[in-house]
Amino acid sequence: MARVKTGVVRRRRHKKVLKLARGFYSGRRKHFRKAKEQLERSLVYAYRDRRRKKRDFRRLWIVRINAACRLNDISYSKFINGLKKAGIELDRKILADLAMNDAAAFAKIADAAKKAL
């Protein structure tokens, strides 16, 4: 029985890893072992940050809404409470967009929240 060498399989495996490592810096792009180690780390970071991105954007939206609320003489927590009592169901993403791009509309919503309190 002939001896099976890993030539083709190894080359395919190395090419796959090195293709995914494009854009990495220096030897982490060119050397298989370093590229493989960095790729494993990169995939861990990507997995973690796909979950973290949701939290980060929510925090950003809250900061923007809070800043706009302060301009309209109401705190963020009272604003959100007023929205719930007024029956206004806008999520934080939409509210943050209004706060940044349409201050007049946000002011009307803030007034409605104040009246509901």
UniProtKB/Swiss-Prot annotation:
This is Large ribosomal subunit protein bL20. NCBIfam families: rplT_bact. It comes from Campylobacter lari (strain RM2100 / D67 / ATCC BAA-1060). GO terms for molecular function: rRNA binding; structural constituent of ribosome. The keyword RNA-binding applies. Pfam families: Ribosomal_L20 (PF00453). The keyword Ligase does not apply. Binds directly to 23S ribosomal RNA and is necessary for the in vitro assembly process of the 50S ribosomal subunit. It is not involved in the protein synthesizing functions of that subunit. Belongs to the bacterial ribosomal protein bL20 family. PANTHER family: 39S RIBOSOMAL PROTEIN L20 (PTHR10986). Keywords: Ribonucleoprotein, Ribosomal protein, RNA-binding, rRNA-binding. GO terms for biological process: ribosomal large subunit assembly; translation. InterPro entries: Ribosomal_bL20, RIBOSOMAL_L20_CS, Ribosomal_protein_bL20_C. SUPFAM superfamilies: Ribosomal protein L20 (SSF74731). GO terms for cellular component: ribonucleoprotein complex; ribosome. It comes from the Bacteria.
